[in-house]
Amino acid sequence: MKSLLTWKIRGVTFDLLPYHMKKLFHSFFILLFLSLSVISLKAQVVDSTTSLFNIDTIAKNLGYPWEITYGPEDSLWITEARGYRVVRVSSNRTAAQKNTPPQQVLKIPLGAGEINFDRSSNRWPQGGMQGLAIHPEFMSDINKRWVYLSYVYKKQACPNGGSNATCIFRTKIVQCRFYFATDAGNPTSLPHRDTLTIIDTVLSNLPGSNDHNSGRLTISPFKEGPDDEYKLYYTIGDMGAGQFNNDTRVNYAQNIDTCEGKILRLNTEPDGDASFGVVHEYNTWRQWIPNDNPYNHSVAVFNVLKTPVYSFGHRNAQGIVWGNVNGTWRLYSSEHGDKSDDEVNTILPATNYGWPKVAGLESDNNYSSLDAFANNDRLANSLINYSENTWATTNGMQRPLFATFNWAASAIPADGSNIFTWPTIAPSSIDFYDGNIPGWKNSLLVTSLKYGLYRLKLKSTGDYVDSASSLNIVDTFPLLHSWRIRDVAISPNPNSGTFWVVTDSTGSTSGPTGGFSGSNIPTKDGGKILKLSYKTFLPLALHENPRVGRPIVKDLIQIFPNPVVSIINLHGKKELKKPLLVQICDLYGRLLKEGISYQNDFFIEVSSLKPGAYLLKLYNGYGVEVQIEKFIKL
């Protein structure tokens, strides 16, 4: 049989014979479930993060970091959920400075004043000090150095000890003014220092809980509405209504008059609206509620009031971000599922996202009391005695952009089982990447409390995940899979290849398996800021073509699949002068393999390579280097 390619490895020459390739079915869902399930068996999980990125710890000993945001003054802003602090570090900070405490710009005291609980509380609200967003004109207008914060500020009923009673907290959103040390009016004592001061309350008395507060903030990157101003968006969860110690709490995610289980849309500055003359919190907040919001209150006496509700039917959306794909801005969100079906959604106004009537994709009907399985009968403690698909169609539900583990009905785990093995990734936040890491442009980065970081490559329209961008819908190489990641911030420099993550201080959850104290489950590198720097930027295209059939060639040669497990296929243009010399090198250019082919289509066996990133160099028959491709070996 004729050899396709002659290889020289370490000076030994041998022939590779052609054979029929098996189609690769590396399903993301199966991969993830198996990886999660075998943790207890101490299986070795190959993490390719260090193959692609340099990782440095630049700060540590943070008090349950919850938010990390890249600020317009090139600082990283971090909120501490249990420290009730806002701190800053320079984006240029290195590992040599990791023992230097971050700069504290705001601290709200616990156990006194408006925060009527402290660290000794047996049941902590989910979150605490939560989301942070910085006004787009922070640096261009000295009068708009505004920062917005959300935090839980009042415990009304949440018994300590072993009681299984419902926990009632209250949450607020505030507007702050930031002062540099040299700014006129800086309120700090001499010598002045950078400081953040609360100047107004946007919303107060919002529902709060020890579960599903959500609490993420973002600001539209463009001015909108009849007042032509930036708008503030806030995720607020369903309070854990219908589960664990809140199982008797009413779930209001489908009630558009309330704030639970919603995404809210607010003004970034008061609009001056006069009172509507009715006694209601929406009247109290009227100057912060945009006049073009989609809903008026449905009760007749309050119908003059706009509500802050932008979308509804959310369970626990802890991530929200704007992204621009090919000139179109979209609002994206990540949301925790129940026992399965975590979601990534495109957020639209006046739109129903299904919870607690539907979990994840409505078409799979994996929650129902009408089938033969017992573990999938309820959502939020309510009987699902209907078809999810029928309900979604009848009620105009928006289908998720992406859902993890749209598990079959027979596979839904039982209530009371170990929640750490449930088929979920626990998506804690989301960000949008439009930089120049090869193959990553226009991707959503979804952080996970169970399994690190995932990338979803969007199609050119921005409204679907590009399932043709890699062998699986998300990257098949693991990223930060040993860490419990709370949030991610991305450098605005498209060529820096730099982003930062904050790691949760413990592995505790809101459920009974994790415990309520938040102190009994260890996690890797807890309470740190990790800086990830892409190892090299080369003029390469990272082609991610999963088709086993021949792809369309845009350059002289194309390789697929990428990432690869064992076999790389190469497809070249026929006008290439033969013979072709192919070399495989590491990222430092050191030659590992080389071979010669007289054909346009051939394959390379790379199973002997260690997991990581490699270069494939192509030379034509004249000895001219005509193309370099980068590929990932799993």
Regions picked out by a protein language model, each given a short descriptive name:
Residues 2-16, 546-560, 564-634:
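C-terminal outer-membrane/trafficking sorting elements
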Residues 44-241, 319-324, 329-337, 423-466, ...:
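Acidic, Gly/Ser/Thr-rich repeat motifs that build Ca2+-stabilized beta-propeller blades
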Residues 485-487:
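Repeated scaffold domains used in trafficking and secretory/extracellular systems
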